Amino acid sequence: MTASGVPTAGRVTKEWAAEFPGFDAWKSLHLLRRIGPVVQGICLDRTTGDDGYLPTVHVHALTREFPVVSLMLGQRSARPSGMPDPVLFARHERDFAHAVGALREQSRLPLDELPSIDEIVRQYHAEARRRLEKGHGAAVPEMEDSVLVAAAAGRDELAGEGLVLARELSASWPKSSMPFDWPGSDAWLDGLAVRAGDRESLLSVVRGQAIAHKLGKIRDHLAPDGVRHDRLA
């Protein structure tokens, strides 16, 4: 607590971590938990004026080389109107319990229980479908992550489902929304299938990304053999 009575970012981080003991504090205002080849996060994203934070849940796949932990499948805490629902640091003590409850209720993935690889992958699938339905363009990263996370976790059948869905959706993606270096659907799907079929290379990328993002202190709740650790002590 500062002299003005406004809680520090460190205290806010600790209080959120206490509410969600399955997560670990990764950085200031950012909690993570690792589930094998993917991390699930609670990011207390600072507001533009730096006087508050916006609770945001997300996931990030470790199966792609990426310079930062992304906010994929991000869901910001929202009011009934759909507008963002930030928490001012000056009102944190008053609004904290409401913010925690709202995030729990709104998150599509469980926060108190450990989501399975299946649940996470199917949320990628659902997001890809939503993007197409709403006209938001191609969901290339979502579909790639869904396939590669499943493959890295040894869920070959689930990865296969993702490849089938990727073929179905990519046929309807508007050309104007495709990445500038798009090789074409067939070449993309063939390349994705090859990457999914090389689990050892995927696991090597996962290990490298865990080191690059300094995840050593973040517990991995999925054992190397794919068995989940349901007791989050």
Residue ranges of model-derived segments:
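Short, surface-exposed loop/strand segments
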Residues: G5-A9, R34-V39, G49
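Amphipathic alpha-helical segments
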Residues: V6-K27
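A short acidic/basic microdomain associated with nuclease active sites
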Residues: A25-G36
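Intrinsically disordered, low-complexity regulatory regions enriched in serine/threonine/proline
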Residues: V38, C43-A233
